[in-house]
């Protein structure tokens, strides 16, 4: 089973509903505040809600260079077994998490949750 690390990362170290910003910040190596600004800019540019999948997917793919990876029918743990190395953003229904070298970083243990989207991030 993949490793799990409880990960809270934002400017004031408060646990909040910020999974998109937190996960993208960790996976990209960008500061939390910079990702928050990029999400707002992307939302204005594309006229979409910044937490809508199609909106933040554009940021992940077009700006940050993430590329889609097949994850059909997999849990995070299944995915980690197939992709033990590298940095990935993994989307579940209503949530997104980061997998780095066989370790899931998130505010809760989601290793058994089913993935709907996965992106491999370039090396930081």
Name each model-derived stretch.
Residues 43-94, 100-109, 116:
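Conserved active-site-adjacent core of cysteine acyl-enzyme catalytic domains
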Residues 35, 39, 110-111, 118-119:
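Alpha-helix boundary/interfacial micro-motifs
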Residues 2-5, 101, 112:
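Low-complexity, intrinsically disordered short peptide segments enriched in small/polar/basic residues
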Residues 116-124:
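Charged phosphate-binding loop/patch that engages nucleotide di/tri-phosphates or the phosphate backbone
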């Amino acid at each position: 089973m993949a490793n799990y690390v409880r990960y809270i990362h934002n400017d004031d170290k408060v646990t909040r509903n910020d999974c998109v910003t937190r996960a993208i910040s960790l996976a990209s190596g960008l500061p939390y505040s910079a990702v928050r600004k990029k999400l707002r800019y992307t939302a204005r540019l594309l006229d979409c809600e910044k937490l809508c999948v199609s909106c933040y997917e554009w940021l992940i793919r077009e700006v940050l260079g993430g590329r889609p990876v097949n994850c059909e029918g997999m849990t995070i743990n299944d995915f980690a077994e197939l992709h033990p190395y590298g940095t990935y953003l993994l989307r579940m229904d209503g949530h997104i998490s980061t997998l780095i070298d066989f370790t899931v970083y998130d505010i809760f243990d989601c290793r058994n949750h089913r993935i709907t989207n996965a992106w491999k991030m370039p090396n930081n």
